[in-house]
Swiss-Prot record:
Its main location: membrane. One of its GO terms (molecular function) is fluoride channel activity. GO terms for biological process: cellular detoxification of fluoride; fluoride transmembrane transport. Fluoride-specific ion channel. Important for reducing fluoride concentration in the cell, thus reducing its toxicity. InterPro entries: FluC. Na(+) binds at G71, T74. This is Fluoride-specific ion channel FluC 1.
Amino acid sequence: MQYVYIFIGGALGALLRYLISFLNTDGGFPIGTLIANLTGAFVMGLLTALTIAFFSNHPTLKKAITTGFLGALTTFSTFQLELIHMFDHQQFITLLLYAVTSYVFGILLCYVGIKLGGGLS
């Protein structure tokens, strides 16, 4: 049954990721991918902290959210492809800004999620 929940979570995450991708513009800053990945980092941190208090009795739900929903929502491969595209088009400042923003804020938001979740549990 766990596979079914992961499948459902994945379908919902993929759908949301698809809808967010419309925020990306041709040749512009990939804001949709950035939003999806930073949101995923925050929620993963939050759920990590909340696992002990709220998900210990519901491991299947946690897997549905983390592996299914967040796994489909976030997209490391698209992020890498966008960086290569920027490199190929000599958009070096945008590439650097996107990479640093994604990594630094991803780590920061995951940390904030962990701290916030720890305060709630």
